[in-house]
């Protein structure tokens, strides 16, 4: 009797601690409660919804009977029609590059976006979580949260925790499955061999060796630490979420109206950053992509998705043109030719309407032709479908999937997902080809004159940079969502075992850039700081016009110059729009539950959480003996955009401005200025700019895995060669290098 009483009391206490969500609580929800709801909806998305209150909301919500709860009834009608035909089933892999799936997920987004209030939004999301494809649900909810007014301030879990299959190798996830099946009971020697360690709190750490020779196909794999970086891929994914290629301008606020120029500069900067990393590893520039030549370097993702489908490998010397994709290749050539001809002519005609491509602002039109499509409102026509999504068509030609317009089921390639596209070296070859179209447009614009570059009365007197040192460290990523829960764990809404993957990543020591600027007046200005290579991989100096597009924008900020000498100190961690390590979702949820005011947490710990570029990757790796590079600083007058008051605008308010370079967008000068146009060397150099040579040193650790347990080279296995792998590796299991003759003759056996 006593035990029963204790059970009843504890059950009542549990209910008091976690109040159920109903219609009444939905109406009165504050930002903290809304945050918790979104976190729960995105937890273990490949499994049934384990939070009973949210499950009941979804089951009891009848979409067809609540047309008055959506601001656009035609959206609801389209959704109901599609549902009758059938959506992508649960368990199948979702990709935006299949026309039918794209239409379905955009309709889902519209349902969430046009919900009249947050109550309807949550109910619709709960219903979708129960009945629609999990990949589509995550995508539609993520985009809706980033664009709805009543969701501002809500933090999304990192995509690598929501769906770890896109960020963790299949062999690592397989080891987690093994641990789950064995309930953590593994032989100690096997744990050593697999690189598994258990902590005192049932947390299992599994090592993912980025230099495992079994995943190497060619020298391009030396860059896996960069291309597979989870924060870099998260940055690219979140950019797409904020600026989807399919989204019309009417969904964007006026601060985002340079969206396609911003899209171009994002791709160009990622490409430039990739080139710096190539030079840091003694590799040359990116090769040109040709449809009619083989891709010499392959890529092996080593990734398996939750339904068992493997992302296909592309081996070396891959032939692009094949029987099944000849039409797609022809489509790519035709689209590209039309756009190139339009740039050369200076205009394009669509449905009888002429669009100019001659002025600086026309880059938005060009961006729509390349990265998106022309809206109907641009032409006042009923059908505008020409030159759409050139980038998607090219990805379809390069990927190992099939370009479908009417089928559900595809095996997606690594290029088909925004969470994984940066991993493949061919992605950068493709982007180079795409960006060359924009460069052609820029070449037709005049070079900047001395008046464009000069800032009268302002001079950069001195630039001092601290010693620049990079190194590799470790990061523990939570991949528990990749492992299925037991029935008891679902009831408890919590996994008994926590699985972490240990990743090796590039980092740098903190540094400062100190600027001494002389001014004869008090004036608002924009300071831009760039970093670029000095020499190529053959140690040859690079011409500035060949090199200008390889400069990465380190920092850009507004500043109020005072009369006289101005000393500006910029810390590497405080440079514009950078993000530090993201908080693990389980820790974030505990923190949200324990605090009373979310605003303080957002300002201190969550700044640039979605839009920030990883601060760790600010610098390329460099060389052990030092890699010489050029730092470029330019100070220009602020040419403020219209309808903005600089005196009342706080550019750090990320709830108001969610773009990736908000400081630059306040200035009328083109993004990438002054390196975006061909440089007239005779008129380029002015007192308000300065080139400074800097050196980046790479610190090679004795064992780069700082938090590694006692031994990794397996001393108990005689078959292992215990020699150290040279170059950039660390002590690892060298199973494939062991001194065993593998050329066994089967007849002898």
UniProtKB/Swiss-Prot annotation:
Keywords: Signal, Storage protein
Description of what induces expression: Suppressed by juvenile hormone.
Molecular function terms from GO: nutrient reservoir activity
Known tissue expression: Fat body, and hemolymph of larvae.
InterPro entries the record matches: Di-copper_centre_dom_sf, Hemocyanin/hexamerin, Hemocyanin/hexamerin_mid_dom, Hemocyanin_C, Hemocyanin_C_sf, Hemocyanin_N, Hemocyanin_N_sf, Ig_E-set
Gene name for this UniProt entry: BJSP-2
Signal peptide positions (record): 1-14
Source domain of life: Eukaryota
UniProt family annotation: Belongs to the hemocyanin family.
Protein name: Basic juvenile hormone-suppressible protein 2
